[in-house]
Amino acid sequence: MAPDSRLDFEYGRDITHGKIVLGNRLENPYKTENIAKALASLYPTKAGRVEVDPTDLYVRFLPEDEEQCAELEASGVKLLDHPLDYDIAVDGDWYHDPDIPEGDVTWQYAVVPADYEFPDIPYEVIHKCFIADNSTKTKSGDIDWEAVERQAYVMTGNEDKLQNASSTKAAAKIAPSGRITIVDDRANGGKPFGVAGVRVSCNSFVKFAHTYTDRDGYYQMPKEFAANLRYRLVFENTKGFSIGFNMVLVPASVSTLGKAGPEGVNMTVTSDSEEKLFRRCAVNNAAYDYISRCSYEDMDIAAPPRELRIWLFHSLKPSSAVMIHNGAVLSIELLEKFLGDYSSILKYFMPDITLGMKDVLTYSSIYSETCHELA
């Protein structure tokens, strides 16, 4: 693949990154009842003989603190702060349920296996779902489960979300792929380069796929889709760190990449992009590079601990390596003086490194500030 391929300087310029505004609630095509109806519609003679057993559960959790969030993450649960069966009227990076008091952790939505053992954390099962990719019975037999899935979209009023919805011929499923890059006039000779090791997530309703970019920003999802998808960057990195805090109290910040087709998203982040997105990508690359170079063969220095948590504060100037999440003990009074109004969130999540981003605008200055605190 050519080094300058999959660059897109225009994609994402009109995407907003504030609070998500929900639209109408939609009928979930993956509910077992809806898959069963679609199956009966296409295969009326088999409907009574083929059981549509749940493969997954669409749920929401209400964790009280960091410990409960960590417990969910340790069990492999990927959390989102907004419901999956609503249209999104206005794109954004975060959502807070209006029934949950400001300052408390909002409902966290997820899709878990049907046999998931729930921890002692408040939860609700919203729907029992059937996702053909996750079922062993779809690997054999003479039922076209892709056609059943598509029919479920049609019968639930979601046909417009299918790729080539107006066509009479079903579109082939595609594994989304693309490239996420960043460019700055004073870095890499002004040429775009990859946003490295960051998680890319996409979904249509409760069907998700996740993967990580490589060093050059390329990614390919492990699942195939026929519907349009919502894409996002989750700043949790393969090098063992996460970039957190952006008005939503979860350990890894999210930057939406908006809605696009199943072929994938290419995006080149620039200094003209939304500032939080640009800064997160710059910090991501600085931490990725620094940790990569801590090996004996390179700088031969001790790498930062894994599960490192980096917070960005866009209205503060000072930075610090407080290392609270990794066990350092500091005076609460000193932290409150340093963080000011932000100190109240310490009851939920503990940072290791805080980066003050006020007036830190260029890729090189963000990169330098990050490496300084990591050292």
Q: PLM features: what roles do these ranges have?
A:
Residues M323-T370, L374:
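Active-site scaffold of zinc-dependent metalloenzymes
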Residues G157-N188, A282-S295:
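A short, Gly/Thr-enriched small/hydrophobic beta-strand-prone motif that recurs across taxa
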Residues M1-D133:
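Long, solvent-exposed N-terminal ectodomains/accessory regions
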Residues A2-P3, L7, L22, Y58, ...:
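Beta-strand-rich domain onsets/edges
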Residues Q220-R230:
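Short Pro-Gly-centered beta-turn/loop motif in secreted/extracellular proteins
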